[in-house]
Swiss-Prot record:
<feature type="compositionally biased region" description="Basic and acidic residues">
    <location>
        <begin position="122"/>
        <end position="133"/>
    </location>
</feature>
<protein>
    <recommendedName>
        <fullName>Major latex allergen Hev b 5</fullName>
    </recommendedName>
</protein>
<keyword id="KW-0007">Acetylation</keyword>
<feature type="region of interest" description="Disordered">
    <location>
        <begin position="1"/>
        <end position="151"/>
    </location>
</feature>
<feature type="compositionally biased region" description="Basic and acidic residues">
    <location>
        <begin position="17"/>
        <end position="31"/>
    </location>
</feature>
<feature type="compositionally biased region" description="Low complexity">
    <location>
        <begin position="134"/>
        <end position="144"/>
    </location>
</feature>
<comment type="similarity">
    <text>To kiwi fruit protein PKIWI501.</text>
</comment>
<feature type="modified residue" description="N-acetylalanine">
    <location>
        <position position="2"/>
    </location>
</feature>
<feature type="compositionally biased region" description="Low complexity">
    <location>
        <begin position="53"/>
        <end position="64"/>
    </location>
</feature>
<feature type="compositionally biased region" description="Basic and acidic residues">
    <location>
        <begin position="65"/>
        <end position="80"/>
    </location>
</feature>
<feature type="compositionally biased region" description="Low complexity">
    <location>
        <begin position="36"/>
        <end position="45"/>
    </location>
</feature>
<keyword id="KW-0020">Allergen</keyword>
<feature type="compositionally biased region" description="Basic and acidic residues">
    <location>
        <begin position="103"/>
        <end position="113"/>
    </location>
</feature>
Length: 151
């Protein structure tokens, strides 16, 4: 019966004026239409839009359902950031020290390997042949004479 009276009052007012009763109608029509499962979905999709429309209308009627929606939103908000923060923190901490620890010994072993064979052992060739490939290629190209043929 109340909805019938509200509708007649809304139609009696000019179009420029919008009474608070119509806002209450909007919230009342949305609340029964949305079951608890859909309330969570709508809260996830648009949490900001539901709160402002429900709060200024009538705090007495929609209070229990808005409180439930707010509780659901609070629970969802507290659950979502916590796992994300926990997942990123452990991944970052162990990920950074492991590669650094692996790389440092590799460089040390390479340096010791290059330093150790620098001194020729018995029966080995001199260290000149142990030059890097780039140096050997440069010396080979510079030492080879270029033959020009005159015709």
């Amino acid at each position: 019966m109340a909805s019938v009276e509200v509708e007649s009052a809304a139609t009696a007012l000019p179009k420029n004026e919008t009474p608070e009763v119509t806002k209450a109608e909007e919230t009342k029509t949305e609340e029964p239409a949305a079951p608890p499962a859909s309330e969570q979905e709508t809260a996830d999709a648009t949490p900001e839009k539901e709160e402002p429309t429900a709060a200024p209308a009538e705090p007495e009627a929609p209070a229990p359902e808005t409180e439930k929606a707010e509780e659901v939103e609070k629970i969802e908000k507290t659950e979502e950031p916590a796992p994300e923060a926990d997942q990123t923190t452990p991944e970052e901490k162990p990920a950074e020290p492991e590669p650094v620890a692996e790389e440092e010994p590799k460089h040390e072993t390479k340096e010791t390997e290059t330093e150790a064979p620098a001194a020729p052992a018995e029966g080995e060739k001199p260290a000149e042949e142990e030059k890097p490939i780039t140096e050997a290629a440069e010396t080979a190209t510079t030492e080879v004479p270029v033959e020009k043929t005159e015709e």
